[in-house]
Design a protein with these regions (language model features):
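Conserved phosphate-binding catalytic cores of ATP/NTP-utilizing and phosphoryl-transfer enzymes
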Residues: 70, 75-104, 109-119
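Single conserved hydrophobic/aromatic residue that forms the stacking wall/gate
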Residues: 180-189
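Phosphate/pyrophosphate-binding loops at sites that engage ATP/ADP/AMP, CoA/4′-phosphopantetheine
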Residues: 43-58
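Short glycine-rich, Thr/Ser-proximal phosphate-binding strand/loop in the N-terminal lobe
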Residues: 4-41, 121
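Short, acidic/turn-prone active-site loops that include or flank metal/cofactor-
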Residues: 31-34, 83-90, 126-134
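Short, polar loop motifs at secondary-structure junctions
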Residues: 64-68
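Gly/Thr-rich phosphate-binding beta-strand-loop-beta motif of the actin/hexokinase/Hsp70
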Residues: 2-20, 100-116
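Glycine-rich phosphate-binding loop plus the immediately following alpha-helix
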Residues: 119-174
Length: 189
């Protein structure tokens, strides 16, 4: 078996990985302004950095919202599309070896995928808030999109300054029948 290259052309990043008989090889993330530039940039950088010849590749599998822009084989290689939710479910099952799990894929948006028995995979929901929201808000409010800088800033912060607590909206604890939280606690507790 030769190598299969998996490429997730997302809304803001392209993720690429190779799989061969020995397992997963060298994951990589590439950012670009448009999906086609991101796809070809990721593919070229991946095979160059890892010393992979086009002859070593049996197949290219594409997924993600940006993969819809690709309707021809990449560099003459066998190229197919797969459902992003199926790919997320299969990938999480493969990595975790769990038979039953919920996969939370937080990209530009966030999706929830249910895996049952390691075989039945279904998309159970999602929200439009994810890493793209964090990057956009960080760019506007903090003047940086660099996630490492954002994390450093967050580590210096005081969570009580932004995390709404029950005592902030109610001066008495909620009845036990509604929750176990006391007035000074947050949902994180």
């Amino acid at each position: 078996m030769g190598m299969v290259i998996g490429i997730d052309v997302g809304g803001s990043t392209t993720k690429i990985i190779g799989v061969d008989k020995e397992g997963i090889k060298h994951p990589m993330i590439v950012k670009a302004e448009d999906p086609i530039t991101s796809l070809f940039g990721a593919f070229g950088k991946y095979i160059y950095d890892n010393g992979i010849s086009l002859n070593d590749i049996d197949k290219v599998m594409l997924t993600g919202v940006g993969s819809a822009y690709v309707n021809q084989p990449l560099y003459g290689l066998s190229t197919d599309h797969t459902d992003e939710f199926l790919a997320n479910g299969l990938g999480a099952h493969y990595n975790s070896q769990l038979q039953d799990l919920i996969v939370v894929s937080m990209g530009t948006g966030t999706s929830f995928v249910k895996v049952e028995g390691g075989k039945n995979i279904s998309h159970i929901g999602g929200i439009g808030i994810g890493g793209g929201t964090i990057q956009g808000l960080s760019r506007l409010l903090l003047k940086t999109q660099n996630i490492h800088q954002v994390v450093k800033m967050a580590e210096k912060g005081v969570i009580e300054n932004i995390d709404l607590q029950i005592k902030d909206i109610c001066n008495t604890p909620l009845p036990v029948s509604y929750t176990h939280l006391r007035a000074h606690e947050t949902c994180a507790d």
